Amino acid sequence: MKVNCFTELEVYGKFQSAETKNAIIEKIDIDVIGHFGNVTMLDIPIRIGDCLYSNPFSSISSTLSCGVFIQALFNLLEIGDDNGVKISSLNKIPCRVIVSDNKTVAIGNFMKNKFIVFEDLLKTFNEKFNK
């Protein structure tokens, strides 16, 4: 699935009072919650300064959308090699996040002006898979 990437300026155009912050992805966890139909949840704790945000991606809540998001994140952050990568081995990954109204709205490559906007990713996902 083709995921749209945006520049920082383009993301600022989508959200009022947006602010970019340097951050660290502490780790990536996928949890299957044993109630409400065995919901799959993606948990990616992100540290911004002294604050740890435990689940800014709460709208990513199905097995397929978790996979699509992880693939988009790996492509964005240029994680991986020919042998694959164990998600459990990933930690302390530098990134940039854009926050608007105390909500993480986009994540970006630390070295490049490239961001994934969660709202756009979910819209693209729903158009492709929830017809």
Give the positions of each predicted feature.
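Short beta-rich binding modules
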Residues: M1-K131
